[in-house]
Amino acid sequence: MRSLSRLAIAISLASSPMAWAEHSSAIDDLLEAARQEPAITVYDSTGKIIEQAEAFSKKYGLKAEGVKSKAPHTLERIIREAQAGNIQTDVAILADAPAAAAQLLDTGFAYNWFPDELVDTISERYRDPLAIVMAPNVWTYNTALHDTCPIGNIWELTEPEWTRRVTMQDPLGKPSYVDWFNQMAQHGDEAMAAAYEAHYGHPLANEESATSAWVKALAANAPLLTDSDSNAAEAVASPDQQDSFIGLTSTAKFRDNANGMTLGICEDLDPWLGWTYPSIGLIASGTQSPNAAKLFLYYLLTEEGIAPQAQDGKISTRSDIALPASEPSGIGALKAQLFDYSPGTAIDDWENRQDWQDLWMLNYRR
């Protein structure tokens, strides 16, 4: 198992299943060992990591610095530090599971760690690599123009009625989107085919995967592509928008409803109203603070630790931690309608990224 082999790289805390039997004892042991170690630096693509690192430092009396950094920059930093033998990054939270697996785990530049005491609350699918949160991306509509979502099936987005009226980030510049395509093909193709038959009354009449057929048809329907979630959300639900669009955005954009936006989630969309994408927590091989790094990952897996990101609709991988009632999108009550990413097949996503990008590029029409 990859996590166990890499755990031996830099472990100073003796661990066994019994070591995690008591919450307080396990955490006290980690904390005691961490007090003998240097301060840690943690990189994440969300600015909330700064707040989380400060709260961690205050709670445990340790020094941790949070740095906002996009996944490609963090990956490059860890790789260069490992190659130079000069480790400055201790923990990385990466919203790019395939790259994390291929460029850091499989090279030994970072390693996976999972706290055994959480085995009853974190599904096996989220343990190796360790997924801290799942970020929902949802199909949205303008609640000022429609009482309910104007579509009921994802295949409707490929039809003439919605030509140039679907908006989303450009998959050629957003790797998570093509990873989503590959995940659907690997784990959700039967559901995509069933949705096609439910909508049109007959099976899909070709031998290719239903997912690839949908991707090609969506690309050919001239969607409005943007370079950010914000632009996609504005196209759907800005205060002055008079045209009806369906958009794919993160749940974080629902914060803007407080400032006049009118985003709504397409509930009960067949087969899914959206999908999730993980943030993977890894420890840099060669860190001088392995115990503090583990304690920080554990902290992010607590309700207190993940609270700042939960406000944006990011869902803890712990089954016993719910989103706060104040989260603006309401996605917590709709989790069962999301297509859930499988981190265990992230390498397959990495290997097929170019193929899905090529498929999109060849079929896209403006």
Identify the role of each PLM range.
Residues 6-16:
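Bacterial N-terminal signal peptides
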Residues 23, 340-366:
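Conserved C-terminal helix/tail region of periplasmic/extracytoplasmic solute-binding proteins
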Residues 26-35, 43-63:
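Short, polar/charged alpha-helical segment
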Residues 42, 85-94, 225, 242-250, ...:
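Paired acidic/hydrophobic, glycine-rich loop segments that form the ligand-binding mouth/hinge
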Residues 43-54, 67-79, 87-237:
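Extracytoplasmic ligand-binding site segments that recognize negatively charged/polar headgroups
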Residues 98-103, 237, 242-264:
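A ligand-binding cleft/hinge motif common to bilobed small-molecule-binding domains
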Residues 121, 134-137, 209-218, 260-285:
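Periplasmic-binding protein-like
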Residues 275, 279-344:
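Mature extracytoplasmic/periplasmic domains
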